[in-house]
């Protein structure tokens, strides 16, 4: 039998002591209720006011500290707007730093998109009117300030932006916001003893050991029996999540980033890279409770161990516990959900050009070059399709502004038509081929950017300039 070191003995003793004093149900029973962000539903030209400001909030659950957010709250409200309408935006910056904001996934021209070229100094405002001309999608808004987007997003400048269309509104889907249609914003953080966020600038990676969902660690939500719709956003700076249900139950994947899939897909797990979004349905008809978790299910011993000695691991890997209430729903069968989407049609269309991008994750380079705002890296023609081949030295997220793509293949896996959805962000673990469609114009003054979705690497310059004309 191998001998334990003194350090291992002390660690084991500490865990054993903790286990002896913590009742088994305590970890679940002491959860806080999920906070659902306020909803701004845009109707009849209602303006969307987003005021960036400091506020107070107990991020660690016990210490009230200064954080950033919108309209007096930590994080931003969920914006819901219908395709075919106009977004009358009113951005106000009441923060001590200059801020640029982008709505990732929004299909709009470079001039209206926002992004790094639209910097608001302290006290400044910007009020664009943006036509919404894309199908149902889950977008998100965040800081896009050059060399400072990670810090500002981490402080709380993030929120969900949902686009609905006729199909999504008429589909047989849960649609009661905060009841059976739940937005979940995932962030990993690290705190000091006073509950303040810890952050190291100019680092290629950041992973915190505390997982917050809508600003709450390991929350629960009471839901009616039936199907529950979870709209997931990975707003972490660098961490990807391997999501699954802790009872090994299947989930229905219905949408990714910018569109529905042609048909709902049963999945046991789902990888969500930084900046990526997905929609899943969870069947709560025949179970009393289930937890969405990241990684594998942990025993009580493992939970206590990670709370005491987590390192880069999450102290608690619970995203959300769902607790079913009431009687069995009459609609407990798995819905046969199919959706109209033109994403698969791109496979049959002509490719104007093929480009290859090699991402050096360690040094923050794309094709051995660092971001230069004065240099155009890609010039594309509006209305064309290009094949981009993505390689990365280490697994990393990749994202693009103002355009959309489908994933053609990942490694040896060639995606089938029924697996395709429009996307703007993808996890590059091995060679990944995407077909990119350019429908929006950008200029030298207001270009689009592409590059890693790891905001730490983005701030180091792992980006490129995209002009579409």
UniProtKB/Swiss-Prot annotation:
Listed GO CC annotations: cell division site; outer membrane-bounded periplasmic space
Post-translational modification (record): Predicted to be exported by the Tat system. The position of the signal peptide cleavage has not been experimentally proven.
GO MF annotation terms: copper ion binding; oxidoreductase activity
GO biological process, one term: FtsZ-dependent cytokinesis
Function: Cell division protein that is required for growth during stress conditions. May be involved in protecting or stabilizing the divisomal assembly under conditions of stress.
Family the entry assigns: Belongs to the FtsP family.
Designated name of the protein: Cell division protein FtsP
Native organism: Haemophilus influenzae (strain 86-028NP)
The gene coding this protein: ftsP
